[in-house]
Amino acid sequence: MKAKVIEKAYFIFLLLLPFVHFSITVDPVLIPRQLYLASFLLLVIFLLYSQKDCHIIPVKKPLFLAIGSYLLLSIVSSYGNFTTESHYVLSKQLVIFSFLLITIHLLYNKILHIDYLIKGCIGIGIIALIGAYYHWIEKTIDGEKIFRRAGLVKSFFANKNLLASILFMCLPFFLIGLKQSKKVKIISIVGMLSAIPILILLGTRAVFLAIAVFGLLLLCYSLREKYGIRKRIFGLGSIVILVLMMFIYKNLVVPKAKDIATSKSTSAQYFYRIANSNTFISRTKFWDNSIAMWKEKPVMGVGAGNWQVEFPKYGLDKMNSFSIANGTETLQRPHNDFLNILCENGLLGLIVYCMIFGVIYYQLIFLIRNTKRSSEKWNFIYLLGGITGYVVISFFDFPMERIEHQILLMIFFAITTSSYYSRKELIQESKIRQSYFMYGFTAISLYALIVGGFRFKGEMETVKTYVAKAYERWDETLIHANKAENYFYKIDQTSIPIDWYKGMANSNLKEIDQSLVYFESAYHHAPYQIQVINNLASTYEFLGNRQKAIEFFQKAIQISTDFEEARLNLAAVYFNDKQYDKAFEVIDKMKINYTNKRYKQYLIPILEKKINAVLKQKNDMVLSRNLAKRITRSQHIYNIYIAAKKNNVSFETEILSMK
């Protein structure tokens, strides 16, 4: 009886997963779905407490050892730097792997049947598609050119790329569903056909590559099983042609992408979006910083959840993004899960994480070789293709961060491992009592609930903080920021410490001494966040601690040489300190900014001092008279400076040319 309840609970859990979406949090799905998963595990554990005849697979098996080692390394790598983000990442990983282990044992003990998981995952795919088509139709009715703004189609997920990857991960279940009942078969066919237009619209290249690898794997196996050597050669020839087509695309289509960027044609714009390599180039720069981060702590890494805090340390100006260089856009991940693990958990952590996949691959190959029924064998091939596609996507995106992606991946793993041990004769069961496992999983679920609950409340108040700050209601900003911060939540989803918002509020309320306390605390939590450093330096200057101000402005510029606010502020500090040459040197390295009013306001007085210094040094009356005739307004000084930049000469050279 309880087995049926658990099966239905799993099915309903999977169907409701996409609907767990709260607009009142910073990320509408991340924390809510962790809470949902932890609550579901508690329910399953409660239902299992009275299940006495549950056989436990020995914990010394390779998969369990690899998972345990990975989690242990995640904890050890964070030693000495265990932050609120470490709590979050660790709680998420613990609850996800607990879901895997419980599901494996439920399948192994026949308490849960695979069909319920298959149907539930098919349901996720169908619901995702319904949401995607709803967004497509809604935005089209609103007059949006949806092929140019495909990012508006997100369904129940955070962005279009995550939607595309979730549809890919449902593909193996759709294919397995073709061998199920007539109703499930029809739904699977509808799902696969409906996914094609959505995937084309989204244009997520990592998913296209994953689909290509998935199809290639299926093709290779099909050729191996069904055809003779000639047809295999023909098939391999087709693969070579496909590779050549990709080469042609890279070398002929991509270079011409700029030519169609300004085209008004919808199809041309779509192909430009697909061919545009700017996103990939940007990500390689993220990866460069990540490699530099790993080299500093190659064995154990910087600690779970700390990539986002450490990333700016390795330079932001090379990102080729104005918003990143100026700290208005921040990064939370390197868009490569394996690189993220390498940075946070070190080389040991990455090796152990890869071992988890290695064990699963070994089990799948064993199952494919030793399964006699063709339909069942193909099911394992679909799972193999799905896991391989996931690995491909993980090299260019961050499915590891997302609960829904991890649930589907863990279901891949659970089906594989339970099937593997069902075919292998276990010499002995685990000597650890079942109740101990239940206590452990209960503790993990409660830990995930506590961390998630505090972060959920923190994100709710952070959203209110954003709104109050945008409308410059500083009293409200301070109130909501105080409510947002707690033991498990000190940095928001944009990698900005909550104390920074408190500092901003106090600064605008003229409580400068208190703002300094909060900015120093924010700096402690995020020592390389340039907005935090800039505000801390400005506060030091306001309170008369000029040396500290200069030190921190220089640190901000060292991290991002193109950080305009810090350059302007440092130039102003040098100017006020009568270090005019240094003030000119700092502001002269800025790119000419025609929109920032402070740029011109600060530049002209510094240029006046520079002109006076040149005239005093040269002591040339002719030059002085000519400049006096040419410069009658401050705008004329600015024009001379612009001319020097256009002529690619120094400001002093431009002045001397006026003799």
Question: Predicted regions span which residues?
Answer:
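Conserved alpha-helical positions within TPR/SEL1-like repeat arrays
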Residues: 500-504, 531-541, 565-572
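Structural marker of alpha-solenoid helical repeat scaffolds
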Residues: 487, 491, 525, 559, ...
